[in-house]
Design a protein with these regions (language model features):
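Formylglycine-dependent sulfatase
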Residues: 1-465, 470-471, 484-499
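Bilobed periplasmic-binding protein-like "clamshell/Venus-flytrap" ligand-binding domains
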Residues: 98, 432-435, 502-515
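Intrinsically disordered, low-complexity polar regions and short flexible loop motifs
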Residues: 479
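A glycine-rich phosphate-binding loop feature that marks nucleotide/adenosyl-phosphate handling sites
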Residues: 518
Length: 519
């Protein structure tokens, strides 16, 4: 058999339990079918709870403190991006392409950075620019969806924005994203959007991926990364998908109490917004509001206090955004079938990180690695991959780079922390001890100086804050809702997890990358 094609499909801020196959009441028939036809990893975690670090790790196979993107607002250096799996595949006969949200570089920057994703730099690209970008030969990018503020000049390096504006009606179309249809219940960052689904970025990504498959270089195998930018906040689902799930029928979090007195100190500091520099924190908030069309009330979601009624509407919209993505995933998979590509294409589906979505009284994301934020889906389907299997081995999105190269018949040319998932699928006796993640918060973004490390095994999870030595340890088998912190009770187990953290390769960059913006 010839070398397989590689299709990587990712979503953004998509919890690992928000799929039909996980038992929740979200409609995902096409992704459910993908899981039925392939193997899914039940205990996959993100290497970071933030978009930019996680995506840089997915591309490079490196942990954040090694590739340097430790938080949002820090750009992945192009020379580092060019060492990722896409570049190596491209040099070895694959046609490589990226379509959708990359977020390898920051959007809202303090000054122009020269990248196509930067608001201030994108207008300087030519109308014909289609890559290369971060090792991908071809790139079709977007920012709009999360970023609802129109750019002053045409963003020629951003293809969805370019497409939306081509008839001169871009400003009017963009305004529809933030136009709220009834009912508006005042829930945080939640509304039914007036944007027609045909103009929505999820539909655009589906269309562009299908077009790319039909126009590909047929003499070469392809590696295509299709990156959907939902269900990231704001939860502004378009009709009819915003009405697909009834608020009174959605799944509510089983445990919605914060119980901060039972948690490590930084939980309370985060929720109470105890900034190390209050004036800086206000400045950050004001800058964020100037860049978004988001409601000012609880814009940063630290003091989240929506009612159950409002939370139900948020979850219904979140589900609708997922179902719209699922619809387009189905269209893409149908295109593989119609073009005779499915039998020789490895499909990998995952997300960069999750969302608290009401767990423990929290919303969105931040420095508490509850399962809703940390765990993501990992589904693989393709030649040689068993159907209907569920692996309980702990794995990470950092494994994507090594896995893509392994399926193509290569080993990483550069250092790679991730390990190929192919070995776990090919060898039933193969095991993994743990998966690892890390996040050094940028105090300028968060007002807190935290150095977080997290280790996940099949049964347990421990998070440790390295500056203070505080932490939390949960038995996810007996305590799936993470209500009882065992950190100060299980000294032997805690020591084992500390050893896992210390086993991380000592290859961190020695000079921190300078933030270019907020995100």
């Amino acid at each position: 058999m010839s070398r397989p094609n590689l299709l990587i499909i990712t979503t953004d801020q998509h919890r690992g339990d928000c799929y039909g196959f996980e038992g929740r009441k979200v409609q995902t028939p096409h992704i459910d079918q993908l899981a039925t036809e392939g193997t899914r990893f039940q205990h996959c975690i993100t290497p970071s709870a933030m978009c930019q670090p996680a995506r840089a790790s997915m591309l490079t196979g490196l942990y954040p403190l090694t590739h340097g993107v430790i938080d949002n607002g820090i750009d992945l250096p192009p020379k580092t991006g060019d060492t990722g799996f896409a570049s190596q595949l491209g040099r070895n006969g694959y046609h490589t392409a990226f379509i959708g949200k990359a977020h390898f570089s920051s959007y809202n920057t303090f000054s122009p950075t020269g990248t196509p994703e930067c608001h201030q730099s994108s207008p300087n690209f030519s109308d014909e620019w289609n890559g290369p970008y971060m090792g991908f030969e071809e790139a079709q990018l977007l920012v709009l969806g999360h970023e609802l503020k129109e750019m002053a000049s045409a963003p020629k390096g951003l293809h969805y924005e370019r497409w939306l504006r081509k008839d001169g009606q871009g400003q009017k179309k963009l305004a529809l994203y933030g136009t709220k249809l009834t009912p508006d219940v005042g829930a945080i960052q939640t509304w039914n959007s007036a944007m027609p689904v045909a103009w929505h970025h999820s539909s655009w990504i589906g269309d562009r991926v299908i077009d790319h498959l039909g126009q590909r270089e047929k003499e070469k195998p392809f590696c295509l990364w299709a990156s959907f930018s939902d269900p990231h906040m704001p939860f502004d689902c378009p009709e009819p998908w915003s009405r697909l799930h009834h608020p009174e029928e959605v799944d509510l979090p089983p445990f919605r109490t914060r119980e901060l007195h039972k948690r490590p100190w930084w939980h309370k500091a985060y929720v109470e917004d105890r900034s190390i520099d209050p004036e800086l924190d206000v400045a950050i908030y004001d800058h964020e509001q100037s860049l978004h069309r988001l409601p000012k009330r609880n814009g940063r979601a630290r003091n989240y206090n929506d009612t159950e009624f409002q939370l139900r509407h948020t979850i219904a919209n979140y589900y609708g955004m997922i179902s719209l993505i699922d619809h387009n995933v189905g269209r893409i998979l149908n295109a593989l079938d119609e073009q005779g590509l499915a039998e020789n294409t490895v499909v990998l589906f995952t997300s960069d990180h999750g969302d608290w979505l009401g767990d423990h009284g929290m919303m969105l994301k931040g420095p508490m690695f509850y399962e809703g934020l940390l765990r993501v889906a990992m589904i693989l389907r393709g030649p040689g991959i068993s159907a209907g299997q569920i692996s309980k081995e702990p794995v990470s999105n950092t494994d994507i780079a090594a896995s893509a190269l392994d399926w193509a018949g290569f080993t990483p040319e550069q250092a790679c922390h991730g390990q190929s998932l192919k070995a776990l699928l090919d060898q039933p006796s193969a095991t993994r001890d743990f998966a690892y993640g890390e996040w050094d918060l940028n105090p300028q973004n968060w007002g807190l100086d935290l150095k977080l490390r997290v280790v996940r095994t099949t049964r347990y999870k421990m998070t440790m804050e390295m500056n203070s030595g505080a932490g939390e340890l949960y038995d996810l088998q007996d305590d799936p809702y993470e209500t009882t912190n065992l950190f100060d009770q299980e000294s032997k187990l805690k020591k084992e997890f500390e050893d896992m953290i210390r086993s991380r390769p000592n290859d961190q960059i020695t000079e921190a990358l300078v933030p270019s913006g907020l995100h």
